Amino acid sequence: MNIVLMGLPGAGKGTQADKIVEKYAIPHISTGDMFRAAIKEGTELGLQAKSFMDQGALVPDEVTIGIVRERLAKPDCEKGFLLDGFPRTVPQAEALDSILADLGKAIEHTLNIQVEKDELIARLSGRRICKTCGASYHLIFNPPAEEGKCDKDGGELYTRADDNPDTVANRLEVNMKQAQPLLDFYQAKGVLTNIDGQQDINKVFADLDALLQSSRS
């Protein structure tokens, strides 16, 4: 079962990824994890990636794709994998198809967790931090007992600059524009399924699970 998991920030992608890999016993492969593992193993591509990361530069596609190739060829991917954070562009998706073809595989499912923009803004801008102790709250998911005050020490709660609703909205707009060509690519290949991410976490997983189960039978 070879899966690409997509979704905008705040859609709950990480939560659902954890549930899928636990249920289906496949590796959860994120770009960051791949880079860290390649660097730790001291591979040639890992060292190349590190040199770019140390400079604060983006790792070029050819290095990233090489690391993906090495990762997907490992034995734990034999029965499938879940890719998270890769591919990000159509050229990367085309390179992924080429890698998988060499391995006698293909992407079977691209799962896109959809949440309305207003809901994403509410989720992402609801975080509040205590000025005194740094404790984190969320107005929707983990609100303080008393509005504006930390439960632990009564410290004032504040909103970080990058959690400001306008900043969040702008960030989402950029992400949406970047994601659309990739969604179109997988739609054209007939492997894209949009999942309603505004439901309860367990209901979202039930929908994902039903889809994956039906494709196995």
Curated annotation (Swiss-Prot):
Binding annotation for ATP: G10, A11, G12, K13, G14, T15, R127, S136, Y137, Q199
Signal as UniProt keyword: no
Chain ranges passing through the membrane: none
Main subcellular localisation: cytoplasm
GO molecular function: adenylate kinase activity; ATP binding; zinc ion binding
PROSITE patterns in the record: ADENYLATE_KINASE
NCBIfam families: adk, PRK00279.1-2, PRK00279.1-3, PRK14527.1
Protein's name in the database: Adenylate kinase
A Pfam family hit: ADK
Record field: catalytic activity: AMP + ATP = 2 ADP
Residues where AMP binds: T31, R36, A57, L58, V59, G85, F86, P87, R88, Q92, R160, R171
Region (NMP): 30-59
Keyword field: ATP-binding, Cytoplasm, Kinase, Metal-binding, Nucleotide biosynthesis, Nucleotide-binding, Transferase, Zinc
Region (LID): 126-163
Description of how the protein assembles with itself and partners: Monomer.
